[in-house]
Amino acid sequence: INCREEDLGPVLHATKGGAKTVFEESVACIGAHVCQQGIRDSQGLLQKLVEMERKEQFADGILPKIYISGCPSSCGTHQIGVIGFRGGAKTVDNVLKPAFNLYINGSDVQGQERMGKEIGTMLEEQIPDFLCTLGHTVSNSGTDFKTWFAKNPEGIESIAVSFLV
């Protein structure tokens, strides 16, 4: 960033109240409110998830940074996160509902690059509950997410199963 010293004050003011945890550094594309190709409001989902994390008062490191794309175009790079969501829709009881496909165990770390594994579809309304359950599971383990996931590589998927449609 090319920021002069005299511009620092306004920049700090504009970013006040920004990300306070690793989870709040999560990535979301611009989403369907702006993007003509977007299917889901990825920014709106991320905002709901950050509100949930703050309400639950999870310690920093309990939830990982996640990646959210509002459609298959992957502008939110959902495939590279340990948890990623790709926007879509799912018919449930003959009603088309907002949904996201869940991807897990992706990585953009140099030397460990891999695409995440798609494990299923989750209704948008269920995603905060899924991540809340994950957060409590990690918190109750007495470790942070990285340590918990290293010891429980199937942990995310086993929690997610009950939220998939």
Predicted regions and their residues:
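Mobile "lid/hinge" segments at catalytic clefts and subdomain interfaces of large enzymes
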Residues: 86-143
